[in-house]
Amino acid sequence: MPLLSLSWLGLGHTAASPWLLLLLVGASCLLAYILPQVYAVFENSRRLRRFPQPPPRNWLFGHLGLIQSSEEGLLYIQSLSRTFRDVCCWWVGPWHPVIRIFHPAFIKPVILAPASVAPKDRVFYRFLRPWLGDGLLLSTGDKWSRHRRMLTPAFHFNILKPYVKIFNDSTNIMHAKWQRLASQGSARLDMFEHISLMTLDSLQKCVFSFDSNCQEKPSEYITAILELSALVARRHQSLLLHVDLFYHLTRDGMRFRKACRLVHDFTDAVIRERRCTLPDQGGDDALKAKAKAKTLDFIDVLLLSKDEHGEALSDEDIRAEADTFMFGGHDTTASGLSWILYNLAKHPEYQERCRQEVRELLRDREPEEIEWDDLAQLPFLTMCIKESLRLHPPATAISRCCTQDIMLPDGRVIPKGVICRISIFGTHHNPAVWPDPEVYNPFRFDADNGKGRSPLAFIPFSAGPRNCIGQTFAMSEMKVALALTLLRFRVLPDDKEPRRKPELILRAEGGLWLRVEPLSAGAH
């Protein structure tokens, strides 16, 4: 083989061939990696020209930064759903397209696709992984499918039914605190603060059978969960903090790791203790025995769960699912219930009708307690809850990453590799889907008015194969807490209108403040 002279690089004739070969191999590998990427970008750009897009900031940033986590950001999303009605294309920088979807007909092929075709996008959810591990929220593929099958029995009504007593007790504790604070007539309260503690109180009892009395005194575990949620939301707002190496060096990163350790240690200790005390018998017999003795908690069900091959969950898997349930169950329910009270405070006529419905249901009942069978006997209260979840959905959007082309109903195609942003908020506020979408009108959810409406027009708990497994739990808790609250208190709006703030869930800047007035015993 003839040698090429590379003496100008300081290499002799004997070294020239190997260096040239190495250079050629390296360049070929680089081109083999880059060229398909470049081709995919240009091919996707060509195919995405069929999707309209709002005016970008500029060619470099695209639409990056146009939607902030603020009231103005939500108003911008509303304007997108009014303008485009179904979908639009959004560019994050010059290379990364996102398809935003606002219409049930266009949501359907994405959200109902198999989990392998449209898995959750990991860009944002990865911030939760050190805390939640491979639980249902973050796992994919066969592991997600296996866990989903194994966890479904944990949300059967036979398991949920005894939890209603816990919901009553936790709500009673919150109300006793409100009565003390309103002893002089009325109290101005941040609903998120009080209701978050109430939902966490219920969850600790339902998941771990542990009573931390967190509504009355500080709890390290509860404080850690609240801090983790706040830290993840704050990290999402800063692009610089998206870099793991940098984030771990910051004060927030150190606080995040410390809070994770505390939460994991608590969950691990409960699992170890329960492993020691769990009866060594068949799953069904153990479930029946524990059901007779006390309320089955989430850990019990996870420890007794077996897949179709008779394999149980590992302790690591159980911890991930328990931590996921604590995360997913407290914030979303607290957001939903807080905004429901806000909407009923703004519409006293609906509030009073709900109150009368509850009074009629509990007439002459002592003590005043909501039971499982009562939950189906509150139709108007349920309509008010659903309308609030439409107007103020706890989760404003969900993301999916297409692993293959997805055909939309009008023939357009979302290319493989493109992220889809399903806008729950935009769909719920789309005038093409909901007439007068900014008006709070519970009668939208009257059975007669819902005829002909797509089930995907209302998706506060998502939909499809990856919908919220705990939605019956959440709805039951909201019904109990709302019914008892309206029975005992009149809820009034604050002087200052709240500014909405979408983070992990839909919050209000500076808290969601309302006034509560205890109702006299005679008013009952």
Swiss-Prot record:
Binding site for heme: C468
CDD domains in alphabetical order: CYP4F
Assigned GO CC terms: endoplasmic reticulum membrane
Domain of life, per lineage: Eukaryota
UniProt record, GO biological process: arachidonate metabolic process; fatty acid omega-oxidation; leukotriene B4 catabolic process; leukotriene B4 metabolic process; omega-hydroxylase P450 pathway
Record's keyword terms, sorted: Endoplasmic reticulum, Heme, Iron, Lipid metabolism, Membrane, Metal-binding, Microsome, Monooxygenase, Oxidoreductase, Transmembrane, Transmembrane helix
Membrane association type: Single-pass membrane protein
Molecular function GO terms recorded: arachidonate monooxygenase activity; heme binding; iron ion binding; leukotriene-B4 20-monooxygenase activity; long-chain fatty acid omega-1 hydroxylase activity; long-chain fatty acid omega-hydroxylase activity; very long-chain fatty acid omega-hydroxylase activity
Pathway named in the protein's UniProt entry: Lipid metabolism; leukotriene B4 degradation
Pfam families: p450
Membrane-spanning ranges: 15-35
Chief site of localization: endoplasmic reticulum
Catalysed reaction, written as an equation: leukotriene B4 + reduced [NADPH--hemoprotein reductase] + O2 = 18-hydroxy-leukotriene B4 + oxidized [NADPH--hemoprotein reductase] + H2O + H(+); leukotriene B4 + reduced [NADPH--hemoprotein reductase] + O2 = 19-hydroxy-leukotriene B4 + oxidized [NADPH--hemoprotein reductase] + H2O + H(+)
Cofactor needs: heme
Function: A cytochrome P450 monooxygenase involved in the metabolism of the pro-inflammatory lipid mediator leukotriene B4 (LTB4). Hydroxylates at the omega-1 and omega-2 positions LTB4. This oxidation step leads to LTB4 inactivation, which is postulated to be a crucial part of the resolution of inflammation. Mechanistically, uses molecular oxygen inserting one oxygen atom into a substrate, and reducing the second into a water molecule, with two electrons provided by NADPH via cytochrome P450 reductase (CPR; NADPH-ferrihemoprotein reductase).
Name of the protein in question: Cytochrome P450 4F3
Organism: Rattus norvegicus (Rat)
